[in-house]
Amino acid sequence: MKQVVLGTHETSRWPEFAGSTWVRLQYMLGLTKLGIECFWVDRLAAVDPLTHSHTLEYLVERFDRTARQFGFHDRYCIVYNDGEKHFGFSESSLKSLTESAHLLLNISGHLPPSSQLMRIPRRAYVDVDPGFTHIWATQVDMGLGRHNFFFTTGQNVGTPHFKIPLNGVNWQAILPPVALDHWPARIDGSCKRVGTVGDWRGSQHAVYEGEYYGGKRREYIELLHLPRIAECAIELALCIGPEDWEDIGLLKSSRWKVLDPFLYAGDPYSYREFVQTSRAEFSVAKSGYVKSNSGWISDRTACYLASGKPALVQSTGCEWKFPGQKGLITFRNLEEAIAALKAFDRDYDAHCRAARQLAEEHFNSQKVLASVLSHVGM
């Protein structure tokens, strides 16, 4: 049986960031269904009980719980503090795996040169932050040279439409995979929630040619008066840090409903329930995705589509990928956002069916990951 290792960084540190966990889960579940023996190795830096809200024991227990719930409790290893401890399978098993595995999928390229996993012959850098990754690569060593395959969720990367130079790297565009068995359609016209879950600012920031590429805050502020003008309640389960708490009042005064993401979507199951009990997704994109014209499509949006929920999302230049389709509506400004909110409700059932069809045709993990394996010669 072919073996693939999913290499990640600090996923176990933040169990309440369930959307990030699902990004990795889709690969585990999808590859397993393809008949691949897939292993998850997460690199976790030291946990200081004085500064971190969770103990190491709690973090390991939460990760193990997720692994058991999704059937890979014997196929994960948390490498703690550069190998001081190993949780899940043992250090010796990890060493054996590096000698037998056929492919490493290095999510976001966070694994350092010293990682044992970098000995695996096929090493693929999987970029999930197009635009940011490519700007950073023009400024610092991102470790791209330690890989021999390169995948990105930016559909425009490598085309004349993308605004950031590639420095000779041959990126292959892929869509975010969704394990459809775990995301069944739940079309229900009685669902009311229109909104999304995510970060207000996020951790991705970059400056390129004097221009700032950042998170979602600025994009939401541009649409501040949307709920009042469109007469539509929009619910945002957003992680907003203390430095931006004043923004919560600003949003609420403009008739946005702000929810606690950790309460409503703080683990993989509640995250899925939040998505699947929604009427539709409404979300902006990080300004870095928009300004670079990356063609990025959110893994979260893919989950909404799989659930049979229309997605109304800010344009990043991906429209050419889905020409004339219902189910996925993009907007560039306030006027187009208002039109999008009105459009999906005029033929709601048709948009729901189209959303699921888009997921089956384009985001199905069986198709996306089979193409990845084919590209690397597996």
Describe the role of every protein-language-model region:
Residues 1-4:
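Extreme N-terminal starter segment of soluble prokaryotic enzymes
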Residues 6-161, 265-270, 274, 290-292:
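Extended catalytic core of nucleotide-activated donor transferases of GT-like folds
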Residues 10, 14-15, 19-21, 25-26, ...:
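Catalytic binding pocket for nucleotide-activated donors in carbohydrate/polymer assembly enzymes
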Residues 23, 161-280, 288:
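Conserved catalytic-core segment of nucleotide-activated headgroup transferases in glycan assembly
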Residues 28-37, 67-75, 145-149, 171-173, ...:
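Structural alpha-beta junctions
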Residues 36-39, 123, 194, 234, ...:
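Hydrophobic anchor at the start of a short beta-strand
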Residues 113-119, 142-144, 160-165, 246-253, ...:
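Short loop/helix-cap segments at secondary-structure boundaries that form the rim of catalytic
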Residues 116-131, 166-184, 307-309:
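P-loop/Walker A phosphate-binding loop and immediately adjacent motor/lid segment at beta-alpha junctions
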